[in-house]
């Protein structure tokens, strides 16, 4: 896509705001002066639109209905993007906090749904069989309080549940944020001890469980 720029001040900085050709042809914009600087406020109708985060449609469905994933998709072999989420005790947790360990990262829409409940219990069971250098993280948009309550009721000991509700840091960095619902898609990522993505599984239908055997196979092959 061709880059579009509008100069908004006398400083030598071009800010990608809107397609200039469309702006010149449109009367639907207002330019205001704020503290001596020109700040364009542009109302656009189609055509050249801002694309802050990449969007993917048709990758996954929710009960058969296609949804839009936003963020930056990750690929096997790339350095795993760092992110910051919130633990049950409200402390900040980053992926880099687990440097030197293999991480299984499972994103789910909500622990309060039956499929997410089943999935997290299954990973909790499997995590108990893995070595101490492997950690399992389950990330959702649930509030930390709700996650803590659920873990207590379900007896979850081997999986760390983390909340992405504050900044959507994980969902944006891994391309699994559902635009229409502000929930995370069902996906599983395996990151090795060197911080490299070794496995990616985006579950096509959110209402179904992931392929556990494929995830465990990827971990055991590291």
Regions found by a protein language model. Give the residues of each.
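Chalcogenol-based redox active-site neighborhoods
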Residues: 48-222
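Bacterial N-terminal signal peptides
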Residues: 35-44
């Amino acid at each position: 896509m061709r880059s579009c720029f509008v100069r908004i001040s006398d400083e030598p900085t071009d800010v990608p705001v809107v397609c200039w050709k469309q702006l010149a042809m449109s009367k639907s914009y207002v330019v205001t002066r704020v503290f001596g600087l020109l700040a364009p406020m542009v109302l656009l109708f189609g055509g050249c639109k801002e694309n802050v985060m990449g969007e993917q449609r048709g990758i996954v469905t929710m009960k058969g209905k296609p949804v839009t994933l936003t963020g930056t998709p990750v690929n096997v072999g790339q350095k795993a993007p760092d992110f910051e989420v919130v633990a049950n005790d409200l402390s900040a947790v980053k992926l880099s906090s687990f440097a030197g360990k293999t991480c299984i990262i499972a994103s789910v829409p909500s622990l309060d749904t039956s499929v997410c409940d089943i999935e997290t219990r299954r990973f909790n069971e499997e995590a108990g069989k893995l070595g101490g250098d492997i950690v399992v993280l389950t990330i959702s948009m649930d509030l930390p309080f709700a996650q803590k309550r659920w873990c207590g009721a379900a007896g979850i000991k081997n999986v760390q549940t983390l909340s992405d509700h504050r900044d959507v840091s994980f969902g944006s960095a891994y391309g699994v944020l559902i635009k229409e619902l502000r929930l995370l898609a069902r996906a599983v990522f395996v990151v090795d001890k060197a911080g490299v993505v070794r496995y990616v599984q985006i579950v096509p239908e959110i209402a179904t469980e992931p392929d556990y055997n494929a995830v465990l196979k990827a971990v055991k092959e590291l």
